[in-house]
């Protein structure tokens, strides 16, 4: 859902707040909580979960391993929830022909580089480039070649876009910026 006028084009970037990431965070949290409860119930010798009688699972070695998996899963789940709440990777791309500027903004992890803000002059943009790799792990990435800076990716490498969509986006952006398109 981009916002576009005659002189300004703003392209929002989703970042880590995707449905699949929410699903993985919930599944991982519930699964690791289950493992931790089973390990704890085997240690206490009580049924904290009514699905498994605590006598069937010995604390050593099954209960210890399940507790370890539960704790590790909770750490990974908390990491996922932090990236979701901080919207790591989210932001926007703003192309302003009136001012002759391109601004790329992304949210990062807390610390020195929490806000990643890049600015370029439109006249320094050499081309819009499409990099396509076919095969089992096919990927298509849209880059912007900046003179003296190299290529800056505009789409995520894990986005599953069709060749038609990436070509259309590249053509619209190249037309808006008045630069050529390169395909690799």
UniProtKB/Swiss-Prot annotation:
Residues passing through the membrane, by range: 22-42, 57-77
Any Pfam family matching the protein: Ycf4
UniProt keyword list: Chloroplast, Membrane, Photosynthesis, Plastid, Thylakoid, Transmembrane, Transmembrane helix
Membrane topology: Multi-pass membrane protein
One GO CC term on file: photosystem I
Location relative to the cell: Plastid, Chloroplast thylakoid membrane
GO terms under biological process: photosynthesis
Main location: plastid
InterPro entries linked to this entry: PSI_Ycf4_assembly (IPR003359)
Biological role stated in the UniProt entry: Seems to be required for the assembly of the photosystem I complex.
HAMAP family associated with the record: Ycf4
Protein family according to the UniProt entry: Belongs to the Ycf4 family.
The name this protein goes by in its record: Photosystem I assembly protein Ycf4
Gene source species: Panax ginseng (Korean ginseng)
